[in-house]
């Protein structure tokens, strides 16, 4: 699992997180049997449920778009988003996209 962290109330991928996506793209090019699920999350303590659902969706879609632009076939990418309805992480880490790699 790889995590891409976002600033509060933002779906923009920070420069320091882009390197993680680049490494993931290289891994996927080397391991063509692997697929990924990208799950977006948002912080329940900010915004409302509607806003947080849209924000988590946009975060996940932005990561997927970056991977596609790096040559990863969209058939290998599943996008999922949870808004603030699922909180498996501590508060500081809720503003993230979690990427699960499967063979």
Regions found by a protein language model. Give the residues of each.
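Secondary-structure transition/hinge residues
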Residues: 29-32, 71
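Envelope-exposed proteins and targeting segments
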Residues: 2, 9, 32-34, 75, ...
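Conserved phosphate/oxyanion-binding catalytic-loop motifs
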Residues: 38
């Amino acid at each position: 699992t790889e995590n891409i962290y976002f600033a509060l109330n933002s779906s923009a991928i920070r420069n320091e997180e882009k390197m993680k996506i680049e490494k993931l793209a290289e891994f996927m090019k080397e391991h063509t049997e692997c697929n990924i699920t990208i799950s977006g999350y948002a912080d329940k303590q900010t915004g409302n449920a509607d806003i947080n659902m849209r924000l988590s969706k946009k975060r996940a879609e932005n990561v997927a778009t970056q991977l596609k632009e790096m040559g990863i076939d969209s058939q290998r990418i599943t996008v999922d988003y949870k808004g603030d309805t699922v909180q498996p992480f501590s508060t500081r880490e809720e503003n993230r996209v979690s990427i699960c790699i499967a063979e």
